[in-house]
A protein has these predicted regions:
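ABC ATP-binding cassette signature C-motif
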Residues: 1-181
């Protein structure tokens, strides 16, 4: 559960939220609406730990994984499919650990990491990422294209694919339909 108690949030000295009390429970779907500049993105930044409240309390479950679709996607050299796969931090950690174990010829670690990889469904990760990209309108030929080559709208779709690839407890969508081509 997410709990805000008497929470106050300000930016540049301007109060965005004052004395807010709110409880959000698991499996709830909540929309946050408001005019430009009213603090929706700042609220999300509070949830991700990028901002801190001026007063009051924010309680998030300590082990929750948060996926966030921001409004901007940097121009990266990473290919679209790999960018999407980067959304699954545990997958990427296991892959990195596996490469390291293979370099060290550590058979026991390799065996354990392959078990972990199977447990998180790592063997189907590329297919799942491809399905996400197809669902968002990407063609197979786009998978290896660098993120930097896509227009802003297509980068927003890549951000969404990356967030959906994350096995998260909380998904924050910050204007996910803005700038779509």
């Amino acid at each position: 559960m997410i709990l805000l108690r008497n929470l106050t949030l300000a930016r540049a000295g301007r109060p965005l939220l004052e004395g807010v009390n709110l409880s959000l429970h698991a499996n709830q779907k909540v929309g946050v609406t408001g005019a430009n500049g009213c603090g929706k993105s700042s609220l999300f930044a509070l949830f991700t730990g990028d901002l801190h409240q001026e007063a009051g309390d924010l309680e998030l479950p300590p082990r929750w994984v948060i996926a966030h679709v921001g409004q901007e996607t940097p121009a990266l050299a990473t290919g679209a499919l790999d960018f999407t796969l980067d959304g699954d931090a545990e997958l990427r950690r296991i892959e990195s650990d596996l490469r390291e174990a293979e370099d060290k010829h550590d058979g026991e670690a390799i065996a354990h990491l392959h078990m972990d990889y199977g447990h998180i469904d790592g063997y189907s990760a590329r297919a799942r990422a491809a399905a996400l990209l197809h669902g968002l309108g990407f063609a197979d030929a786009d998978f290896e294209r660098p993120v930097a080559e896509f227009s802003g709208g297509w980068r927003v779709r890549l951000n969404l694919a990356q967030a959906l690839m994350c096995r998260s407890d909380l998904l924050l969508l910050d204007e996910p339909t803005n700038h779509l081509d």
